[in-house]
């Protein structure tokens, strides 16, 4: 072997050596017999370096995985012998191999097993067992091989072909017949031999039993001698976690409901008498997390048994199953309330399913009612934050607690289904007592009290948030709690979690303020002062900006008395912060978007006359326009690229803010009705010069383009005079992405204004197409994926543009471009339909073609178009689906084929018998289609029902493709 190259396998080797080692590995993979050198090195223990041994196994792994069928019988025998002799050597080695080498060796054994077991090596396990016997090193490798085989056969994370899946099923069936009882016996012997002397091997063996129990005969494991041994392991500290997992797999195995019930009950009796049902908070939490998972599995298994027995009408056994479930509830509650969230989380499934049973019962016993209440109290307690929770840097622990809270929320929702009155009463009790003394209560208790009120909104669902009408007792309870929330002063609590929960809840129950509007001023003040938008925490300010926007929007009819006051108070929050002013703004630009939108909503929905609305909107937008002009001048002069970028960002924010205010308008309150057209036209005139700025083009164009999209909706035809010059600037020096983003703007204008923009479209049609073609024809690196994707997206945008033009009744825009240009456009559509393997673009192209045939395909169509139909469009309808890349199993491609069928139907509709004659006598014979199939095709085409032809066309091409 190349010793120099092998040096590069060391993790500390420099990059040149590592590159050489990689190249050597590739070379050995390709070489037909280099693997033999590696096999020999392993069998004869030529190398002591761990990385070289691992490397040799990798080469063998590649050989077995990808090239095994190419080997001769002798070579295949050599690989078997190499592995067995390596295994034998492990019995004698003074030191065991490193874990990563043992795992890799096990993977190679497993690959060889799945390749040879059914054909050449049926005695695989017997051969291995005869080598390893009960030698601890041998047993370790045997167990690793079993786990690797399980991964190959059963692991759902490994994607298998249908062929491999069939093979794996056959292997498992054969193993069940031939060797599983022997394997199970070997596991029993290993467990018995090593349970007190070698915990590592025992735990490995328990893992193997747990893995295999899912697909072998359960009676081999679920019997007295095996179960008693596993239960014995539950009392041995180093084994009990693995024993728990193994028992969980046994309990999880599907079986007859009565047998499952008996199995679970027998396990529980032993565990209970051994004291496992009394949970000690100080107990080892890792073990309790596994134990909780086991109890969850047992509980859910009993519930599945109960469901099956009820379904089968076996009431007697169902009653027994329910009794068995009830006796586990006390244990479930101990685990649910445990201070460690992992332990609690692992039992939630059982708890949830138990509540589902109670929901189905017509009457609950006193004990069941007590259980519901106990679960409710446990959920309320567990929703509470820990004292040491880090709110400033939540990290992974924070994410896990958020996830855990979501699980608890599901329990709360289920509790509401079982006993809504009890839930409401419990929450009300906790909420009221906590808020009476909030000044002296710890933050986590105050937060959870408000949180529970918040969660009731989803737990007790109503349509359109109408919590304060309908059921009187529920409405008055919620109303009381909301009144307490907004009048208690708790919004001043000095903790971010309480502050945020206050605002979230106020917005969640916004309908309360239509019932008791007298509380609006104090809540508005909370939003606007140091409790909300001016809070010391950026996180609170940011979230409040969004919630304030929602609050104002949902209560806009109640806002009229406060509008001017609010606008004055948020004045400083609306300031555009230029990069050079140095001071940190209270809100980020993203947060400011919500404040601008809120200001817009207040103005537009006010009861003021149009003149007042216009004046207020001008006050809001004029500072933006003034700042914009100054910043644009500064950008033109800026030399430093970093400064250019920050100025461009600021300009972009200004445009974005103006754009966001326009979201307040609606069909009822249009820009015109509010008298605000002039203000937005001024904005347009202010922002458009940014398009001619040669610096930071991407960001400036993107902002102005978005603003134009909004103005087309808001200002309608008043925006049209600005479009030609804006388009001209946006077509200068553009890249694929610029064009791709510009085309939707033109599509929007075309679809909205149609004939009104015909002169403009005629004028800019070819310049736009030239810009597109120029970018598409630019050479790119062969393997530049992003460039290829950009071109694909641009091509799609181009075809979408043509589709918009043709479907908006503007085909004369194309027709008036001169014969040569028209032909060029049509040819690109044919290319799009046939040549590019992009079903989305192909579908669009066929839509364009069928539309053009519909418009121009009759007797009075443009000169030469009928020829084009027969020379190009008809062939496209056959050549595209016949391509290998046209995958009829793909949903998008089927849609493209559907439009192809529409195109052919439209040609037949416009050209009549002439079309059928052309297909029968010229085109289809030229494709060597059999006469009877031609006949069949033409009959299908002439069917009045288009769906019949679409279905036929799919079958036609499925038959035609090899």
Swiss-Prot record:
Q: Which ranges of the sequence are coiled-coil?
A: none
Broad class of where this protein is predominantly found: nucleus
Cellular component terms per the entry's GO annotation: cytoplasm; nuclear matrix; nuclear pore
Q: Where in the cell is it found?
A: Nucleus; Cytoplasm
GO molecular function per UniProt: small GTPase binding; tRNA binding
Keyword tRNA-binding on entry: yes
Q: Which SUPFAM superfamilies match?
A: ARM repeat
Using the record's annotations, give every residue carrying the modification N6-acetyllysine. 634
Matching entries from Pfam families are given as: Exportin-T (PF19282), IBN_N (PF03810), Xpo1 (PF08389)
What cystine pairs are annotated?
A: none
What keywords does the record list, in alphabetical order? Acetylation, Cytoplasm, Nucleus, RNA-binding, Transport, tRNA-binding
**A single GO BP annotation from the record?**
tRNA re-export from nucleus
InterPro entries linked to this entry: ARM-like, ARM-type_fold, Exportin-1/Importin-b-like, Exportin-T_C, Importin-beta_N, XPOT
| Family matches, as Gene3D superfamilies | Leucine-rich Repeat Variant
**Is Nucleotide-binding among this UniProt entry's keywords?**
no
Give the sites modified to N-acetylmethionine.
Answer: 1
Q: How does it assemble?
A: Found in a complex with XPOT, Ran and tRNA. Probably found in a complex with nucleoporins. Interacts with Ran and tRNA in a GTP-dependent manner.
Per its database record, what is this protein's job? Mediates the nuclear export of aminoacylated tRNAs. In the nucleus binds to tRNA and to the GTPase Ran in its active GTP-bound form. Docking of this trimeric complex to the nuclear pore complex (NPC) is mediated through binding to nucleoporins. Upon transit of a nuclear export complex into the cytoplasm, disassembling of the complex and hydrolysis of Ran-GTP to Ran-GDP (induced by RANBP1 and RANGAP1, respectively) cause release of the tRNA from the export receptor. XPOT then return to the nuclear compartment and mediate another round of transport.
| Protein name according to UniProt | Exportin-T
This chain's source organism reads Pongo abelii (Sumatran orangutan)
Q: Which gene is this protein's source? A: XPOT
